[in-house]
Amino acid sequence: MPVRRLLAPDAPAFREIRLEGLRDYPDAFGASMREEAAMPLASFEQNLDRGFVLGGDMPDGQLGGVAGLRFNETDRTRHKAWLWGMYVRPPARGTGLAASLITGIVDEARGKVEEVVLTVGDHNAAAIARYRSMGFEACGVEHRALKVGEIYVNDLMMSFRF
């Protein structure tokens, strides 16, 4: 499934899908729906212009999924980049969009860093299996990484090394 880089004009659609993911899967993201819903649209526009975010459209033209790549900027961590904000809407699941987004992120990082890292809730077996199938390997666990209400979420760290 084709993916494309999202830019400032895509900010309203990006904001919509991002907030949907935060609302429907609060234990899957470090950010909260409340925090990001309070951000002005201009913040989403700036994130798209300054960062690297991919999106894939469904046949109806609506964004079906998104994933971002953030490059570290400090001397000692510049060899790594982070895959963040991965979310595929339920109607787009099983279409190959998740694989296309991950491939696009890895391709963008190739030749620029030594590895792409991500974190995923250790309870999210489907996401972990998808990342493993794409070449990511588990490399650590952060216990109690997130606290959603009164529930703690452990994050599995995974890495794709070039």
Regions found by a protein language model. Name each.
Residues V117-G121, R132, E137-V153:
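Conserved catalytic-core motifs of GNAT/GCN5-like acyltransferases
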Residues G61-G65, A126, Y152:
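Glycine-rich acetyl-CoA-binding "A-motif" of GNAT/NAT acetyltransferases
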Residues A8-A11, R15-E16, E20-P91, I102-E108, ...:
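Acetyl-CoA-dependent GNAT
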Residues A13, W82, E115, A126, ...:
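Amphipathic alpha-helical recognition patches that constitute DNA-binding helices
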Residues A109-T119:
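Conserved GNAT acetyl-CoA-binding A-motif
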Residues R76-T77, G85, R89-T103, G121-A129, ...:
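Conserved glycine-rich acetyl-CoA-binding loop
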